[in-house]
């Protein structure tokens, strides 16, 4: 990714991501990178606006996670501290970059608690998060490097695939739009979703969704929910289109953004529903 098209915040977020992954080295097999940094692995081609994110999101697979060493202790030793907000799974670096540790909601027994109890690890180590279920199956190892020339580190970690990221972004946007916390709705998530659909063949994402759902029935509820919500966003004015237009404001005409969201999402959904492949 060209250095001139990367924001300073993203450079710092990648540096802190590598710090966290190094601290959690013994647990790397149970970690999957999700969120914007995963999106940019698959969709490095952007626009005149610098690639931007301020944090790092990691999904934990409880089936693969070892009980030792303690994640909280490892992060603390590396200079991270629990977020003062008290949000479970939110860890803050010395320079204020947040690393979120999340366990897919469907990978744990049902509970009303946000905390994700993990044997051998503190109660606030991670939190349950809906929408990440597919990332435990749709991922591949990627060698991540720093975005600064003087930092020569490389850490190989599993990165969620485009299908998993589309579902995660859709569920995140839906929950924030329909929830009581409208202040947490950001246009960037819709922009990231559109970026994925533009950089990765939309039909191939749809086929991957269908195949993953068939191979791993446990993800069917969340995939179905995301697909149904996306389908309902493609006619008339909708929160998804409004957010995507807002994200591209000043860069791209609203009509062009609207057409791109509708056409690319429809192509993905049609491929997903094409039983004959």
Where are the regions a protein language model picked out?
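Compositionally biased terminal segments of proteins
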Residues: 1-277
């Amino acid at each position: 990714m060209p250095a001139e098209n990367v924001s300073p915040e993203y450079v710092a977020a990648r540096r802190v991501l590598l710090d966290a992954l190094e601290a959690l080295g013994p647990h790397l097999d149970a970690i999957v990178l999700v969120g914007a940094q995963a999106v940019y692995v698959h969709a490095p081609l952007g626009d005149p606006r610098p690639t931007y994110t301020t944090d790092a999101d990691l999904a934990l697979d409880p089936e693969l996670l070892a009980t030792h060493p303690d994640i909280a202790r490892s992060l603390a030793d590396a200079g991270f501290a629990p977020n003062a907000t008290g949000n479970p799974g939110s860890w803050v670096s010395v320079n204020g970059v947040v690393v979120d540790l999340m366990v897919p909601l469907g990978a744990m027994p049902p509970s009303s608690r946000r905390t994700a109890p993990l044997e051998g690890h503190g109660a606030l180590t991670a939190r349950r998060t809906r929408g990440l279920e597919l990332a435990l199956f749709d991922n591949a190892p990627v060698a991540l490097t720093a975005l600064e020339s003087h930092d020569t580190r490389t850490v190989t970690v599993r990165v969620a695939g485009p299908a998993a990221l589309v579902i995660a972004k859709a569920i995140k946007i839906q929950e924030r739009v329909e929830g009581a916390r409208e202040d947490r709705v950001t246009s960037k998530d819709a922009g990231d979703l559109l970026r994925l659909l533009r950089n990765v063949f939309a039909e191939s994402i749809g086929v991957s969704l269908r195949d993953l759902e068939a191979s791993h029935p446990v993800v069917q509820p969340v995939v179905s929910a995301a697909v149904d919500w996306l389908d309902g966003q493609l006619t008339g004015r909708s929160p998804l289109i409004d957010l995507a237009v807002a994200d591209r404001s000043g860069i791209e005409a609203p009509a062009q953004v609207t057409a791109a969201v509708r056409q690319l999402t429809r192509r993905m959904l049609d491929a997903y529903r094409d039983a004959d492949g």
